[in-house]
Amino acid sequence: GSKSLLLQDKNGMVSNTTSISAGLDYPSNSPLHSHLKDLGRLSVMSVSDEEVLESFKTVSQLTGLQPSLEPCHSFAAIAKLAPSLSKDHIIATNCCGNALKDMDILSERLKLD
């Protein structure tokens, strides 16, 4: 067994989740993430599907890469968080995958041909 955090409604039932990225449409996280949060070494924030799509467009335009939608959640969170940090603050994130698996979603949501 394991102990972890999960999204719950006011009655303690597992909440429904939605995400533009199927890989992140899950109401819980790993026990490691819960442990790091308990230690004060991790904080979490949410981003909207629109913010994720905007981060996809920005990263694609600036780098020529087309990341999958999962890391675009991280990029969107960084875009929200960075203005509140000092200029010498270091932000690290990971970019994995590519958008090939997400092309149907991207084409529909970004109105691509």
Protein language model features and the residues they cover:
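General beta-strand structural signal in soluble alpha/beta enzymes
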Residues: M45-S46, P67-P71, T93
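Histidine (H) residue identity feature
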Residues: H33-H35, H73, H89
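Catalytic phosphate/nucleotide-handling subdomain of diverse soluble enzymes
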Residues: A77-D113
